[in-house]
Amino acid sequence: DAVIAEVYGGGGNSGATLKNDFIELANKGGAAFGLDGWSVQYISGTPGANSQWGVTPLTGAIAPGTRYLVAEAAGAAGTVDLPTPDAAGSLALSGTSGTVALVRGTDPLTCRTAADCAADPRVRDLVGFGTAVVHEGAAAAAGASNTASVARKAGLADTDDNAADLAAGAPSPTNSKGEVAEGSTPTGPTEPGTVRIHDIQGTTRLSSRTGKTVAGVPGIVTGVRGYGSKGFWIQDPNPDADPATSEGVFVYTGSANPTVKVGDSVLVTGKVTEYYPNFNGGSQSLTQLSGPAVTVLSSGNPLPAAVEVDTRNIPGTYTPQAPAGGTVESLPLQPEKYTLDFYESLEGMRVQVKDVRVIQATDKYNELWVAADKQDQKSRRGGVLYESYEEPNVGRLMVQQQAPAAQQPFPVANVGDVLTGTTDGPLDYNGFGGYTLVAGALGALQDNHLAREVTAQPADRELTIATYNVENLAPGNPDAKFAELAQAVVTNLRSPDVLALEEIQDNNGAKSDGTVDASQTVAKFVAAIKAAGGPAYDWRSIDPEDGKDGGEPGGNIRQVFLFNPQRVSFTDIAGGSATAAVDVAGTGAATALTASPGRIAPADEAWVNSRKPLVGQFSFRGKKVFVIANHFNSKGGDQGIDSRFQAPARSSEVQRLKQATVEQAFVAKLLAADKEAKVVSLGDFNDYQFSPALAALTKDGVLRDLVNELPEKEQYSYVYQGNSQVLDHVLVSPEVGYAKYDVVHINSEFAVQASDHDPQVVRIKP
């Protein structure tokens, strides 16, 4: 439940440190509290007949156990800014007397007495302070001034009596990220308190002390991070006997650089918070101490021993199942049974891995993934294969480092390389990779000399058709990107006869000015291929409607056919446009498209804010071939496999299933007209070979997914969160028959990439 946690009206007044008044809300409940359509309102301490409530509308939500900061009017004095507020208004609160209400709705209240306000069902919570006549309970909260706020007592006390529930003290504004104002933290503790880290962490994912201030928590500093989410980790050198309770915790210092050092013995006073790095995306939370006051007792102390994470102690089952539609947050941790519980029981503690294989290359954020469990299904080139929703690979672990890369270069690793020796550091949680080892010491990098693949040389009688997602290619990209992509087409793909491209942007890239033409983008790429020794490709495409096909805003990404006119001809049939639906005409050998190029059912709801399939009719040695270039909707909005929701929701899957159903019906219509039709459907389908979308595409055998015909260890085209997986596919109709298919691994496993997808090529004999 949401309550008003703190009120301060002295901002910018004489003697004040803070520049602004503020109202701080808190969520005492176990679920998010939505604030859309709500408001905070203020009225003077002694309202008259003409007094009006001032209103600040709110948006968003308060995650369980966190705060929500509303900045109000600024005064002329003060030297310290509030932490970044979650909402802002212009209410000028009195420093000594007034009333604040949390209201369902944004219409001003009309009540001016305590009784009338108590009777108004829109009022969720109310705080009167100073001599305010509108308050909860026997009296208003006392002690507010230019240097003192009124804040709820321990546990966010809420007995509906302002005088009893709130007390005056130094203002301590805290936002939803747990950030506090500079200089607003109290003096460090001098004696250990009664609460230990394992008491804070508890035996579930959420601390039972969330929202409470804990004093004098002892620990040894095991890691310090001075960039990004700044702070440090502490660990109790005297653990309890419960394997479910972590002995480590992150201390969040907000915008302030931490001043402690690894090996310091410290006492920390701070507020227990649960920080969700991606709440709306379903992430789990990180238990942390915010707004800390720290006392260093001694330095140079030995660190608590690191827990080695490996095949011996990582459970084989990834996660417990939550109640229908619910989360695993309240379930007791079973670290011996479930992988996610095992990692949660080590949250904030020192862990280590030894001689681990890199399963996702170093990225631009200076992070990589390793395989802590050597039993996960290995790909042919050293990654781990994602083969089903039920088997997400338990040993995947992200590795970052505590030191900034400018201070300590991060290893540039490819898949299959090895971090030899020991890599150790605290176990963190973030919204991009889940549980993450933030290394203080990194193992030495052993280069496995991974080579970029080159597809087989085709025979002259083979038609080669390829697909390549070129990742938002636009004329303004560096010439080096065009050159690298082009060289791959010529060398690694051996200049395919037909090349279906995805993510070709319009002529001015990600600029929203109505431009949809991509002729300059394509011309620059075609020229780069020719310069790299490739053929003089011709091309066909259809410009989308502005802003209707998703992707990077302003970019208007689309699919494009490149084809080598010396090897294959394109059958141009007028009538194709962004909004016109292609159909099938004729029967038997006379079967043809009604437009070439054309788009499949562009007005169907399946393609809302997504790329429509581009279909073209080609001729190779007198044989007709229909090619469909695809780019299905992305997985944006899906909950991660490490989500607090188990099983995680795959909301984007619904649209891809609709898209697959529409396309399958089109192919079925082609085959009904000509059962011997040669159809190749390929591209970035943004889904797995075991997904409902691919099952729908291959329904009734109208298409077969060639990735399933590769050796199991070669079935991947993309690497995400340490999983080598299939997002790109080539599918063919039954009469294609002979089909030699290859995923050409040149990008996804490498730190240096021209694109994040691997291209694919198929050789057929129409």
Where in the sequence are the language-model features?
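Short, polar loop/linker segments at the starts of domains and inter-domain junctions
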Residues: S14-L25, T79-G89, A141-A144, T159-P171, ...
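Acidic, glycine-rich loop-and-strand cores that form catalytic or ligand-binding grooves
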Residues: A92-V133, M349, V353-K378, A693-K713, ...
